[in-house]
Amino acid sequence: MGWTVQVGEWERDITFNFSPLFRTMIAGGIRQLAGATADEAATIIWHGFRSVSSTDEEGNHEIILTGSGPLVRGQNTVEEGLNALTELWQACIEARAGDEVMVF
């Protein structure tokens, strides 16, 4: 699924590929992200998961979405939700427009 993600002055079209593990963890199913706008999708992701980012020994950025919860549209704020997508983007900061990002 793809969204346009804006970070600072850059705006990129990014495709997010959600792993089977993520798909099974997301309460309510991954289908609720289909057709959602970037802010809706971000809000859904944010409501159910909290992101933990880190850098490994080789300097690679990693992001892990932890937790579970009822993923319901309209919960929390759009700003918080967009921050979740922004963190996903920042974990793959070297990605270019049209690249695909795998989310575990």
Located regions from the model:
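Acidic (Asp/Glu-rich) sequence patches and key acidic residues
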Residues: 1-104
